[in-house]
Amino acid sequence: VGQTAVVRGRLMELLAAELLPPEECDNAFVVGVFSLLDTMLNVPLEKALESVALPQPVTDALLHGTGVFAPFLELTKACESGDDATFARVADELHLSNRQVNWAHLQALAWAEDLNGD
């Protein structure tokens, strides 16, 4: 789960870098990593986030699936699960090409492997 969280965070960061101001990319990374916090801690996500001070847009994406980061999270999950319909719909909504998303996904996977020293 930890590896998936790191890949998810990095992918969100790279996708956000295509469309959002640079200062928002760190928040996109946090959304990606924290989106699996409930699974990592085996508690509901809302409870896991109670003791963490996060910007409202991060919380909105994580708990409500709304806000600026929500489509990036949805696209990232579609990449992981192979949900082609959601992938196509959200990539189109974000005006990202398949090439951009696939390149970012490969970069995220490679980055996570480098962290593990593989």
Please report, for each region that a protein language model flagged, where it lies by residue:
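Conserved alpha-helical "signature site"
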Residues: V1-D118
